[in-house]
Amino acid sequence: STDLNLGKTVVAVRLLGYKPEYKTTLDIIADNWFSPYRMPYEHDSISVDGTCQVSANAILPTVATIRVNRTEIPFLAVPNDTTTVTIDLPTLTLAATHLFATDSDVKKYVWFEGKHAAVDTELQSVKTKIDVLGVTSFDDICGMTPLQYRDYVQQSYERLLAAINSNAAIGSATRTLAQSILSMNYASALFGFKNNISMAPMIAGKRGVPRADMSIDTVSYFKPLEKLAVLHSKNQRYYFY
């Protein structure tokens, strides 16, 4: 439901194979709720048995993220609901290495329990398809004009949307959620053209990149957003823009 419903969302995390000497880091981050920034929950330290429980106030269902070391695991956090997440830490560590990043045999390292376990599980197969700016994007957009940047972002959006729509492993609820997040990230990327283009050389570590002329005709630049269905839908409640 998209109705406002203030209540506690509880996340219980179990790290299988955990040992304190591993220095494992664990953060749980909300993607909206009261703030336009990704906000970490306060939580207790990981217990010696690898368990950790977090509770936070929420007013809407939202996608939150468990970050274990550098691996991000999205899930649906819902008011007045508890999600139990079991993570196989040795397998996750193996899957995070470049040697096994594409090895399907080491991909299964997380299991969910709760009302939305099916959506949470399916989200893992599309989590790399919901942001138009990927790991090479800032390198790609160095030196682009605003219009070139817009075309780059639009092509990325269309490619990722097609991948979500053709994914037979996800149900309609997960597909709608992934489409909504991708669409709003697309809109966010268009609005953030000045900052992204300006910061690209520094982030990509490139010197001598000419400064782009940031002047645009705003009406034509943002014209593609008129076709974005999520802007006319209640699903935009799941994002902070």
Identify the function of each model-found stretch.
Residues S1-S172:
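A non-transmembrane, solvent-exposed segment enriched in polar/low-complexity residues
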